[in-house]
Amino acid sequence: MRTVDLIEKKRDGGELSTEEISYLINGYVSGEIPDYQIAALAMAIYYQGMSIREIHDLTTDMVASGEQYDLSEIPGVKVDKHSTGGVGDKVTIILMPLVASFGVPVAKMSGRGLGHTGGTIDKLESIKGYQVERSKEEFIQQVKDIGISLIGQSEHLVKADKLLYALRDVTATVDSIPLIASSVMSKKIAAGADKILLDVTVGQGAFMKNMSDAEKLSETMVALGHEVNRETIAVITDMSQPLGKAIGNRLEITEAIEIMQGRGREDITDFICEMAEILLDLAQVEASQEEIRQHLVGGKALAKFEELIQAQGGDLTDLYRHTSAPVVTDIHAHETGYIKELPAMAFGKFAMQLGAGRATKSDSLNYETGIVFEKKVGDSVTQGDLIAKVYSQEILSEKMLTEFEKNVIIGRVCKKPNEILKIIS
């Protein structure tokens, strides 16, 4: 078997056999197949796609390339959740303690941010002392003890994905549905949960720009989950504007706490309750929307979040402090009407310029900077109203102020977007 022949086969639209896929993945992980050949293969897959059988085989081999977690010693139905990425996405930080407050065991590994999208682990690391690294034994024991653990991705999990992702990032093959699906699901399967909820974001602030691609990715990942007896549900959600009101690590922790204190925006509060209902249903726990909301805003989710923070070394006093960013700039409405657009991609990139995100994996973060929106799409504004506050390390330049203001689109018609667009199971 020659690698070049398999690249040619896929380039010409052929279907790779189970044995051929194993040969390629095992050879790449062992170092026998060089980067440049796998780069060529990734581009062939990008253009020619893969059958569901090929994607299943690719995912299976990726899972086998690293350590796998066995969570069977934790009683109950273990649930996991994954988002394909977005701007201002602090859902995991609120949703997982909320679900755990119902007695559902949550064993969750999360990632860091890259580019305009934020990462859950970065947000948690803005809390003084919070330890994102845990051994497998510590991770499992904590779930047994308090019902929840939220850590960073294990270095030993899905080695093939780490190699492939780094390669895709520099070869313009990131947004390939077969490669995204196998990357996401290999990590979820290896992490060991029984049931999986996928938040597939769509819109100009997401990797999936249109509904057709989001549906195809969702259907592929749900099918992969079912192939390995992991019930999987995908929820396609809107990422045309930032989620919630805050973008930035510390600012999003503050918003998460406000939501768990019953002081959050209604739209994101409702969205989290709907997502919780789906996760609880997966875990075979019956709960009404009223019960879920009471857990969220009545203190039970927050108590579980505090328990999580303490268990992982976090400082509860630091948890409740506000951002220490030295410069705060108010942005006001330049006309009267309704907020028509707040493009997520543009504001995600703006937050990156403030230091709240990374352009490359080696970039350091400023945990304190970011944006807090006082108005969102569909909200009415009068000229001069406060639309947002920008938290920065230095005074904003005129260029940055102009850039921010031009992306706040005000119209004459009130149109509020739906957060959940479609559910695929």
List where the protein language model places each region.
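Well-ordered secondary-structure scaffolds
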Residues: 5, 10, 15-17, 28, ...
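Acidic, glycine/proline-rich low-complexity segments that act as flexible tails and inter-domain linkers
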Residues: 1-88, 127, 261, 307-311, ...
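Short beta-strand segments
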Residues: 109, 143, 151-153, 199-203, ...
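Phosphate/diphosphate-binding glycine-rich loops and adjacent basic-rich segments that engage nucleotide
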Residues: 144-195
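A glycine-rich helix N-cap at a beta->alpha junction
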Residues: 123-149, 219-225, 229
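Glycine/serine-rich anion-binding loops at beta->alpha junctions
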Residues: 77-100, 104-116
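Self-splicing inteins and homing endonuclease
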Residues: 61-83, 136-166
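Alpha-helix C-terminal capping segments
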Residues: 47-48, 93-105, 187-192, 227-228, ...
